[in-house]
Design a protein with these regions (language model features):
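Core dinuclear metal-dependent hydrolase active-site scaffold
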Residues: 3, 44-102, 202-205
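Short internal beta-strands
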Residues: 14-23
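Short, charged/polar "capping" segments at the starts of alpha-helices
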Residues: 22-28, 201-202
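Short, basic/aromatic-enriched C-terminal tail that caps enzymatic domains
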Residues: 189-205
């Protein structure tokens, strides 16, 4: 996911915020070894920090990577959550993401497409495991636990090119919300799907 970072930093020297485990792994990559040490800013899970007037709140997630994290951002009393690359969620994850005004949430795969697709068995098991990725169904069930009247935008992201379709992710998430034990229906909130190779439209919260 970060192989293009070295190219970006040749043009702009900007700080790199990441957990200690992620930084150590990055420093081992040939394409990133030239990055000056002082550009790395270590992030600690559960320790909030600020970048100018934006509060950043990292949180631990379950994924088979080098100390991955999800993030919440607060500015002017508004909260935005970014939650991708996780194989499962628990009460802690739900509690952390409650009260968001907008959220970008992983809806990585359709289970049926993955199971019948061409991926090798070990990779299918990795994706379906607790340190893999959220399916469309799990994404919808997670959303049903954090929805509230103030939720302004839901963006589904990190869709698999091989094992998902934008319309399928959208409809499955809406259906899961409608079927859940909640007062809300799937069409009560604006849900969009982030495109792989295009910039999403501006969203105001």
């Amino acid at each position: 996911h970060i192989s293009g970072l070295g190219v970006l930093l040749k043009k702009r020297e900007i700080p790199i915020y990441a957990t200690g485990g992620t930084i150590r792994k990055m420093r081992q990559m040939d394409c990133l070894r030239h990055i000056p040490e002082d550009l790395f800013q270590e992030v600690r899970e559960e320790e909030h920090f600020t970048i100018k007037d934006v509060l950043v709140a990292p949180m631990q997630i379950s994924h088979d990577a080098a100390q991955p994290a999800a993030y919440r951002f607060r500015h002017d009393k508004k909260w935005v959550g970014v939650l991708t690359d996780l194989g499962m969620y628990n009460d802690y994850t739900v509690e952390c993401m409650r009260g968001m005004d907008a959220i970008l949430l992983e809806a990585n795969h359709d289970v049926r497409m993955l199971e019948t697709g061409r991926y090798p068995y070990y990779l299918k098991q990795r994706i379906l495991g607790e340190r893999g990725h959220l399916s469309n169904e799990l994404s919808g069930r997670f959303l049903s636990r954090i929805l509230h009247d103030g939720m302004k935008a839901i963006i589904l992201g990190h869709l698999s090119q091989e094992n998902n379709l934008a319309e399928l992710a959208y409809e499955t998430v809406r259906l899961e919300i409608s079927m859940a034990d909640t007062v809300y229906q799937g069409n009560d909130f604006p849900i969009s799907v982030a495109k792989r190779s295009e910039v999403s439209e501006m969203i105001e919260v």
